[in-house]
Amino acid sequence: MISKIITSIFGSSNDRTLKRLRKRVAQINKLEPAFEKLTDEELQAKTAEFKQRLADGASLDSLLHEAFATVREASRRVMGMRHFDVQLIGGMVLTNRNIAEMRTGEGKTLTATLPCYLNALTGKGVHVVTVNDYLARRDAETNRPLFEFLGLSVAVNVPGLPNEVKREAYKADITYSTNSELGFDYLRDNLAHAKEDRFQRELHYALVDEVDSILIDEARTPLIISGPAEDATQIYQAIDTIIPHLVQQDKEDTEEYTGEGDFTLDLKNKQAHLTERGMVKVEGILTEMGLMQEGETLYHPVRIALLHHVYAALRAHKLFELNVDYIVKDGEVVIIDEHTGRTMAGRRWSDGLHQAIEAKEKVNIQGENQTVASITYQNYFRLYEKLAGMTGTADTEAFEFQQIYGLDTIVIPTNKPVIRDDRTDLMFKSEPEKFAAIIKDIQECMARQQPVLVGTASVEKSELLSAELTKAGIAHNVLNAKFHAQEAEIVAEAGAPGAVTIATNMAGRGTDIVLGGNWKAEIAKLENPTEEQIEAIKAAWKERYDIVMKAGGLHIIGTERHESRRIDNQLRGRSGRQGDPGSSRFYLSLDDALMRIYLNEGKLNMMRKAFSEEGEAMESKLLTKVIASAQAKVEAHNFDGRKNLLQYDDVANEQRKAIYEQRNYLLETEDISAMIETIRGDVFNRVIDQFIPPQSIEEMWDVAGLEEALKRQFGMELPIQHWLEQENDLHEETLRERIIDIATQEYHAKEEKVGSEVMRNFEKGVMLQNLDELWKEHLSAMDYLRKGIHLRGYAQKDPKQEYKKESFEMFTNMLDLLKSNVISVLSRIQVRSQEEIEEAQRQQETMAQAESENYRTADHQAEAQQSESLTEEQLANLDIGRNDPCPCGSGKKYKHCHGSKARYA
């Protein structure tokens, strides 16, 4: 209450920011008349002028007014579009570490040209990040003429590009790319074995389009590059047959309650748990299958992997649904993004879940993979020196953007007031009643030729509603994961009079729905259209536009509330763009997932009793509060999950940074011999310490053990016992120095044989190979630690602190092992000089020649003996198989000896 009073007096933080930025807009507008008078050449020369001023010490902020005026005037000349004042405000917000909330249709693509141009002047590169390939290509081609007019290069980076093309794309001033490709390229760069193989420059400025989708919805999805692991295909198939025999139980067993079922489900967290009864049942079936021994349990250390497979199969069957969480396409299981409704080709669930679903759907089971490199979007985008984002819906997540990314959210006012009619929700008792009401609403819209966009939460629901519309004889388009390729075409037609379009979540997001249909898309379909054709298309569109405007603009129907208010707002935001009319309404039922999972049974029963007759709709403020309460619970739960993930990933992130910095140092540095010398001293000292403790007396020494260790690990045979017997003044320190000196001398002797350049390259190769292999194993070990660390809570220990402590110990152990492995390989390697190699080659050639002469001599002798012992006539009379030994005694098969002669005869 007090905060509202203060806000009403002083204005909100957002209002104060906008007030300050409007003053700067006035400064930019003052420059406009002067910039309009510039010739094209003078306007283009501004880019070089700005770059020189930056080089002379000017700041980007000091150039902002002139730079924005330059872009606005260039855009007017090249693209026929002049930036509105609110777009200038958006551009200023995006220049710094902020998120701009701009409503759908307010021109985010054009707004982005302002901060992109300004930040590209530094020459460090700008990355414009989009959610899919189509938008990356579209936005790049849309803005390319403007940027190239101003002397900046533009490139697109999408999956499947040849390495050289990708490398050039990153050298461009402005690179349009998808979020996943940027992350994967970063990981690939940190797996490269030569600096020339890397793609990215230093990460300078990223402008993320649909920032909420990328930094929040996909925040929990790690980017993973993996390699093949142990194959367990047959186990997945065997365990898949067990699940149909198991019975679900409503709630967990307790001291007071023991159920009759085999497993319970946690729908909120998508987890499954075996009951005590279920555990015994599964163990019995596995024993019958021969996968376990009689008397063994699933918690036996040897069998714990089987339990992992059982839980993966349970989740696959009971918690992941076809056409909701995934589709089967061309014999492969393809994940559906729960937030966008789009398929995520190439992505796979981890922990054996994907293989379990493949077994369930009876498709080819692909092998499990081991993580080679991974990073979350949260940590990848925090690597950029400057990060900004834009979206139509960010204000509801402003707290999370600030907490996790340090980004402030500024709501940009619309150019024209929003006049969309957002109607109150209608609640129905069951889903069939809800669908009947939706169909009635659609029919009413079609009668007045008003276009309708129907938003659904899953592919399954979109197909179910599509079937109902088909039954009712209503023509419509479906936009979901199965029809991803037709996305742009379907969206282009969605604003036509009487058009009905069903879309999952925010499929089609990023593409405006133009009232009356998209006339530009119609023209694009024609080859070399004439002026008459273009004018005819525009005239036809104007007629359709007028019809739609009269009917009330685009009508949005939500078939259920989403887990987040933000996604509901995104759906609503498709209508009422740029001051157009429009309307929206959500239709709900007590069967909806949000109601079932997040409202308790008592509230649901109370609401069921409120319905007196079939088909009755309920709308009230209480209903709105109940729904808002459920969504708030989900948002809080999801935020906690993302924050928790980040806290754990931050531990791994510090280690990742250290490893990747070391890796980049190795790639950039030509000579690492000084590092090798230091490591050699550390490794030998550590080995010697095990057998001869520092400052210890001779009776405590294990000399034989030290001799054996040096031989085994470094290939060094040293008579240490003999030295000690012969030299009375040899003590612990001098002995240590002698061993390390001999190791160093032997290594330098090898270097003299092959040359320093060869040895330097070999050192780098050994270091990189061992670093990559051990890092891969470390990631796997960290993953195992992460999965089980929550159990420390039962011992009254903080799991996060325990994870930090143990992961640090694992990391230091890995580094120690890396040093040992590298020195061991370098010490044991046998090298030969060029003269020795040439001599060895000469000896091999001589031996080969001698062997060849011996074979020829032996053949001649054998033939002579054969001709003496058996005549051709005698051999021809014998009944000999072609593969039998020749009776002449040569030892060859008959077909290769006298058999061949007989055949030719």
Curated annotation (Swiss-Prot):
Alphabetical keyword list: ATP-binding, Cell inner membrane, Cell membrane, Cytoplasm, Membrane, Metal-binding, Nucleotide-binding, Protein transport, Translocase, Translocation, Transport, Zinc
Swiss-Prot/TrEMBL catalytic activity: ATP + H2O + cellular proteinSide 1 = ADP + phosphate + cellular proteinSide 2
SMART domains: SecA_DEAD (SM00957), SecA_PP_bind (SM00958)
Region (Disordered): 840-905
Database matches in CDD domains: DEXDc_SecA, SF2_C_secA
Enzyme Commission identifier(s): 7.4.2.8
Residues annotated as binding ATP: 87, 105-109, 512
Cofactor annotation: Zn(2+)
Manner of cofactor binding, per the entry note: May bind 1 zinc ion per subunit.
HAMAP family noted in UniProt: SecA
UniProt family annotation: Belongs to the SecA family.
Subunit structure: Monomer and homodimer. Part of the essential Sec protein translocation apparatus which comprises SecA, SecYEG and auxiliary proteins SecDF-YajC and YidC.
Function: Part of the Sec protein translocase complex. Interacts with the SecYEG preprotein conducting channel. Has a central role in coupling the hydrolysis of ATP to the transfer of proteins into and across the cell membrane, serving both as a receptor for the preprotein-SecB complex and as an ATP-driven molecular motor driving the stepwise translocation of polypeptide chains across the membrane.
NCBIfam families linked: PRK12904.1 (NF009538), secA (TIGR00963)
Protein name: Protein translocase subunit SecA
Native organism: Actinobacillus pleuropneumoniae serotype 7 (strain AP76)
Lineage, top ranks: Bacteria, Pseudomonadati, Pseudomonadota, Gammaproteobacteria, Pasteurellales
Gene: secA
